[in-house]
Structure formats: C-alpha cells, structure tokens
Amino acid sequence: MGLQDRALFQEKVDYTLTNQSNGDFEGQNLANTSFAGAVGRGANFRGANLHGAILTQGAFAEADFQGADLSDALMDRADFVGTDLRNAVLTGIIASGSSFSNAQIEGADFTDALLDRDDQRRLCGEADGINPSTGVATFDSLGC
C-alpha cells in the first residue's frame, strides 16, 4: 500500500463497533472501510463498493448486500444469517467462522473465497445463477 493509498484510507469513516442497524449505504463507495464488530442488522448495502472492507465479528443478519462488491473483504467470525447476497462479488473473501444460514446467494461469486467446509457444503446445496458482473456461476465459484 502506497502513501497515497494510505491517505485515501484515512479519509474513510470508521464504523468499528458501531450500531448501523437499518442503515442505508446503498451504492456508496466503502472500499477499505472498517465495520469490524459493528451491528448492521437489516442494513442496506445494495450495490455498494466494499472491496477490501473489514466486517470481522460483525452482525449483519438480514442485511441487503445484493449486487455489492465485497471482493477481498475480511468477513471472518461474522453473522450473515438471512443476508441477501444475490449477485454480490465475494471473490477472495476470508469468511472463516462466519454463518451464512438462510442467506440468498443466487448469482453470487465466491471465487477464491476462504469459507468453513460446512458453510461451503451448505451453500453448494443452494448455489444457483451466474454473477452478472463476473460471468461466473455460483456453483462453480464455490468449488462444488
């Protein structure tokens, strides 16, 4: 990371350990933003750029990440129960210890994602669709 990149990162709002439940972040550029330990239950991240974001230990149950770019995000030990991840780009994420129960994943791209084996198997049973941004099938991206 160069000096210019660090300066850009410092301009981002830090949402660490905050309550963002039902917050509206639709379409926003939140690349490299920290939501570590944040509560974002029911929040709207539809179409947001969350590339490289930190969502570690966050609670995002029932949140809407439809069409969002979550590539290279740190999403470990987080709650994504019932989350809408349809058509989201989740390439290269680290999501070990996270829960994706009842998440909607049609068209999501999980290429090179680090997931718990049990989550991967469960998601494979629900995998359907092709990501409109990357052209990759959800089933294939999960290595099913």
Predicted features and spans:
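Tandem repeat scaffolds
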Residues: 1-143
